[in-house]
Amino acid sequence: MAIDQPIKKRGRPPGSKNTKNKMEQKMELVHQRLALLDSSSGSDRDDDIGPRAIIIDCDEDDTDDVMEVVPLKMLMPKEVENEQRTVPGIPQTCNTQNTSNGRTNTTEVPVKGQNKCASYLPKKSSVQAFCGSAMKRAQEIQTKLPAEHPSFVKHMLHSHVVSGFWLGLPAGFCNKYLPKHDTDIVLEDENGNNHNTNYLGGKQGLSAGWRGFAINHDIKVGDVVVFELVSTTKFKVHIIRDKNISPTDRAPGLKSFYACKKRKISKEATDNATKPKEDPETTRVSSKVAHDDTQNLVHEAIDGIRFSDSEMSFDDVMSYSNFNIVVDGLVIDCKFPDHQRRTYYELCCAQKSFLHRHLLRQLSLTLVVGVIMETINIAEGIRACGAGTSSQEDFLIWKKTLQSFDLLGMNVAFLLKRVDDILGLPEQPRDPSECSKYNELKLERSRAGEKVKALESMMLTVKDVLKKIDAEMEEMESSVRNHDIALRKIATAPW
């Protein structure tokens, strides 16, 4: 039974630890249930749904009246957006907001088990005040687009830009204007830069490439995006920011970083509470520098990975200094040692293209890095192969690995051909001692060597004999010459 009177806030005696502990447990339970509702609301098809919010009013503390607002996206069809949803275990009331005086009139609806907290679901006017500004501006932009360019408006959800990085498109729009098969669709931003994405005709949504586009353009939950179809496979994208989102929340994946920074800043503020105030001019300059650093964090390297400034063709690579390994809009040079990156640069130069350019979409970044790295290792192994360093089994493993990479879209045909050429060489035993003929020839050579040694020994003996004979002959010839000389001397003596 409804009672037309404000909810009476109840207090507890100060210092009641038991009560506070119970209250903390109940609040944890409430947040868990709200998180479950939030996780179940991330549907890709959100064309006819609108965000809601739940406000938890908890009056349990000893002296302070606390109103805690817990944002929650409860996706409800427009046909029933004025109807009230029931959150299990949380009391429900209907909340009507008075815009003239800023007060809120609340009608309480008793729910079984009600004791501590009240939950409110704002009506449509409150929802529009919460997140309708961006949608309204998007619709205004859509009305000003050329009539010959079909368009649609998309409200960004958690599953679009945070967890899934998958963007489902309106079925009616896809059936009427987009191809039925898988194809590449170009997204042109407001600066005229083009970004390639993969459109899945069967699922009617953008997959690979949308992640890099969303991160690079700081698209956040609550933003509204207008897609203007300017050609068969090209959208011009207009991004309308949700003014309720702080600049620090613009960087996907950095929430925990900012939370940590916030806690650190709060601690420093407490420690410096007694310090004298700084000069106002210095404070303004420091604030500006901090703001610039916050904005630059979006484009800083996360674990060494940074965003590519533009789509790069291999024709633009003039030298190793401007060679980058880009996958899905992310520069992943940091994943490779310098010598491996140089080897990959040489391989790409030999083929005059990026070897990974045609890899299948939706491959994980870890898998892509592994494929490129193993390709580099195989190329280095082929270069270093020799008769005693690489076996037949090594080449067979490399061949199977390269064949699997080829199926994934990696350009490794030239490496496969090189491996096939090596495998096509006549097979020879690695160790000649394993060949029987070699052993026979070795034994025969040994025997021939022994014969040579025996003959050489005989030759030495013969040479000695020849020397002795020569000496004796010389002695005999000398004796004959001496006798002839003596004879001629006597015969020719004077009378």
Curated annotation (Swiss-Prot):
**Gene Ontology molecular function: any one:** DNA binding
Q: State whether keyword DNA-binding applies.
A: yes
- Where is composition skewed (Basic and acidic residues) in this entry? 268-282
**Keywords for the protein's UniProt record, in alphabetical order:** DNA-binding, Nucleus, Transcription, Transcription regulation
Q: Region (Disordered): which ranges?
A: 1-25, 88-108, 268-289
In terms of domain of life, where is this protein from? Answer: Eukaryota
Write down the CDD domains for this protein, in alphabetical order: B3_DNA
User: One of this protein's Pfam families, by short name?
Assistant: B3
Which ranges are annotated Polar residues under compositional bias?
92-108
Would the keyword Kinase be found if you checked this record's keyword annotation? Answer: no
The residues that make up the annotated DNA-binding region are 152-243
Which cellular components does GO assign to this protein?
nucleus
| Subcellular location, record wording | Nucleus
**Name this protein carries in UniProt:** B3 domain-containing protein Os01g0234100
